[in-house]
C-alpha cells in the first residue's frame, strides 16, 4: 500500500504540513498525481475529536436476487446474502439514528430479470416480457422494500436514487414504493446549511426512459453523434446520463444554494466524473457534468455514487467524487459507510469492504487520503516501495492500530484515519 500526500488546487502539503502553492493547476483533461507522503507530516494523522456538523449513512448495490451466487472475473456476487446484509446495515443505521441526518441508497436495491433483445440493448419493451419475469421482479423488489420498512426506524429518512437494475420494475412502481415524489430527481435539505441533490442517471438512456420523450430523443441524438468505438468504451447500455431538463434543474439548484450560502452534496447511481469509476461505468456525459461542478466548487463539495462494484475515487479541481464499493460483492460480508460532514472536510468511515476516505473541502481541512482498515484490517503494509521513510510511517500507523476499531458508530468516535492511496 502506497502512502501519499494529497494534491489538489488547494495546494500540496510539504513535510512540515504547510501548504505550498501549486502553479500548475489541474485542467479537465490532466490531473496531477499524488506524491509520496513524507514522515514529517505524520503528526497530521491525528484522531478526529470534534463532532461532525451532521452524518449520512450510505450504501450501494445491495442487488438481491433469489439465485445462486455468481462470479465476474475474480469478483463474487452474493445474491441471496443481500437481504441479510441490507437488514444488518439498516439495523445498525437505526441504532445510530440519533447521529444520522438520513440514509442514502445509491441504487440497484435488487438485481432483476429481463427479456431484452441482445441485438439492441439501447431498446427495452418491458410490456413484452413474460408474466413470470414481471412477477419475479415485483416479488424480489418487494422483499427488499419490506426490509427497508422493517429495519429502518421510522424517524430516519431513506433517500434513494434510481439504478439501472431498479428499472426491472416500472419507474412508477419503484418511485411509489421508495417514497419518491413526483420527480425522478429531487432535493433534500440537510442540517447546517447543506443540501443533498439526488440525481437520476438512468435519464437520457433510451432503454430506461419513455419512448419518444424528450430524454429519449436526446439520448438517441447523443448516441448517434458518437462513434461505435466510443460507445463501446464509454456509453454502455446499462448506464445513462443527465439529460437537458434535469441538467437545467441541477444548475438552478446549485445556483440557489450558492446564493443562499449553502454547500452541496450530490448523490447518483452512476459516478459523475471520468476516473471516479472504471471506463464505461460513469454517466455518459460525466465530462460535462464534472466540468460544471468544478466551476461551482465553492458550493459543490462531494459527489457519491454506486454502480461500479469495485468502487473508486477521484478529485477533480476541488470536488471529490466517491464511488461506494458494492454490498453485493463484499467478500468480507458487507459494505456501507458513514459520511461525516465537518466545516472544512468530509470523512467517509467505511464498514466492511467500503473504503474510508478523508476529503478536504476547504483550504483549512486536513489533507485528502483514503484508508481501508475499518473493522476488518490488520497491519498496514507498504507495497511496491523501498522508501525507508514510507516504511517508518507505516510502522507508526500500525502502532496506532494495535487495538482493532469497533464496528459500532457514534458521533463521538475518534478512530484514527490512516491515509493511503
PLM regions and their residue ranges:
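Short acidic, glycine-rich surface-loop motifs adjacent to enzyme active sites
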Residues: 253-275
Amino acid at each position: 500500500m502506497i502512502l501519499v500526500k494529497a494534491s489538489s488546487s488547494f495546494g500540496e502539503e510539504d513535510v512540515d504540513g504547510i501548504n505550498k502553492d501549486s502553479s500548475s493547476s489541474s485542467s479537465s483533461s490532466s490531473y496531477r498525481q499524488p506524491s509520496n507522503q513524507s514522515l514529517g507530516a505524520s503528526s497530521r494523522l491525528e484522531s478526529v475529536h470534534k463532532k461532525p456538523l451532521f452524518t449520512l449513512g450510505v450504501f450501494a448495490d445491495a442487488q438481491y436476487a433469489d439465485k445462486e451466487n455468481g462470479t465476474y472475473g475474480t469478483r463474487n456476487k452474493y445474491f441471496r446474502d443481500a437481504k441479510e446484509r441490507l437488514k444488518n446495515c439498516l439495523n445498525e443505521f437505526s441504532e445510530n439514528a440519533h447521529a444520522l441526518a438520513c440514509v442514502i441508497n445509491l441504487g440497484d436495491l435488487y438485481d432483476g430479470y429481463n427479456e431484452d433483445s441482445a441485438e439492441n440493448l439501447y431498446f427495452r419493451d418491458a410490456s413484452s416480457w413474460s408474466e413470470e419475469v414481471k412477477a419475479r421482479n415485483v416479488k424480489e423488489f418487494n422483499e427488499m422494500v419490506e426490509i427497508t420498512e422493517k429495519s429502518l426506524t421510522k424517524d430516519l429518512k431513506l433517500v434513494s436514487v434510481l439504478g439501472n437494475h431498479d428499472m426491472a420494475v416500472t419507474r412508477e412502481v419503484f418511485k411509489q414504493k421508495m417514497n419518491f415524489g413526483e420527480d425522478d430527481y429531487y432535493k433534500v435539505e440537510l442540517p447546517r446549511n447543506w443540501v443533498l441533490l439526488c440525481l437520476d442517471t438512468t435519464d437520457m438512456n433510451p432503454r430506461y426512459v419513455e419512448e419518444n420523450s424528450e430524454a429519449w430523443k436526446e439520448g438517441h441524438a447523443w448516441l448517434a453523434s458518437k462513434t461505435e468505438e466510443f460507445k463501446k468504451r464509454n456509453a454502455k447500455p446499462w448506464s445513462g446520463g443527465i439529460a437537458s431538463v434535469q441538467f437545467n434543474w441541477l444548475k438552478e439548484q446549485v445556483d440557489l444554494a450558492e446564493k443562499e450560502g449553502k454547500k452541496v452534496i450530490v448523490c447518483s447511481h452512476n459516478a459523475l466524473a471520468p476516473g471516479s469509476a472504471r471506463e464505461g461505468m460513469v454517466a455518459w456525459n460525466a465530462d460535462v457534468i464534472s466540468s460544471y461542478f468544478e466551476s461551482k466548487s465553492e458550493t459543490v463539495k462531494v459527489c457519491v455514487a454506486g454502480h461500479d462494484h469495485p468502487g473508486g475515487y477521484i478529485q477533480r479541481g476541488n470536488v471529490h467524487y466517491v464511488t461506494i464499493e458494492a454490498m453485493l460483492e463484499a467478500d468480507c460480508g458487507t459494505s456501507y459507510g458513514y459520511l461525516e460532514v465537518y466545516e472544512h472536510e468530509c470523512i467517509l468511515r467505511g464498514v466492511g469492504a467500503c473504503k474510508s476516505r478523508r476529503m478536504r473541502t476547504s483550504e483549512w481541512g486536513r489533507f485528502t487520503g483514503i484508508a481501508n482498515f475499518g473493522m476488518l484490517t490488520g497491519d498496514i503494509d507498504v507495497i511496491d516501495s523501498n522508501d525507508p521513510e514510507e516504511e517508518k510511517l507505516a510502522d507508526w500507523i500500525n502502532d496506532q492500530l494495535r487495538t482493532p476499531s469497533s464496528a459500532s458508530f457514534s458521533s463521538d468516535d475518534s478512530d484514527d484515519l490512516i491515509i493511503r492511496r
